[in-house]
């Protein structure tokens, strides 16, 4: 299961080992779950780095030497190196500024299309949810109270908690039609 489902955390700075280089961070899942020859591991690390839009020059660096967006790209590359089917993205863009957030969302959309990934995208940011999700589940007190196709849920919420959640969004005219 751990090989097929990978997690990308909200704060890449705290989820990346500060003692490891970017190369070591991305390679680590391969060492733990997929015993491959060193040259194949190196190729996969380079492939993932390229796929997430980072130059090879970052490979020897430590996380503290990277920007927030670069760190999140490293976290995504680490999650993808095992070629999972599902990525769980837990508030994966909430710690980023709006410009970098848009870049990471565009990257996630490209990766999903190119790799056929399924995302479980956990977020409180409904604009982000609307952009990235095909279906949405709304939870209240640990229970799913409504789910459905994204546009349907945003245009015609059925559950009171969903309506309240959407009504509470600043500038909600952009969120709810």
Describe the residue ranges of each PLM region.
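Hydrophobic anchor residue at the start of the ABC signature
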Residues: 76
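ABC ATPase "signature
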Residues: 147-148
């Amino acid at each position: 299961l751990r090989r097929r489902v990978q997690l990308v955390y909200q704060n890449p700075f705290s989820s990346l080992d500060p003692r490891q280089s970017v190369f070591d961070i991305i390679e680590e899942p391969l060492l733990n779950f997929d015993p491959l020859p060193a040259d194949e591991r190196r190729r996969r690390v380079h492939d993932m780095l390229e796929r997430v839009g980072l130059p090879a020059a970052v490979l020897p660096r430590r996380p503290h030497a990277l920007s927030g967006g670069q760190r999140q790209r490293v976290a995504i590359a680490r999650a993808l190196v095992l070629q999972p089917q599902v990525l769980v993205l837990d508030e994966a863009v909430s710690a980023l500024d709006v410009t970098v957030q848009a870049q990471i969302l565009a990257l996630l959309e490209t990766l999903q299309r190119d790799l056929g990934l399924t995302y479980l995208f956990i977020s409180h940011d409904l604009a982000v949810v609307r952009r990235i999700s095909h279906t949405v589940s709304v939870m209240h007190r640990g229970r799913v109270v409504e789910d459905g196709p994204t546009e349907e849920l945003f245009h015609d919420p059925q559950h009171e908690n969903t309506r309240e959640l959407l009504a509470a969004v600043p500038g909600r005219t952009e969120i709810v039609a």
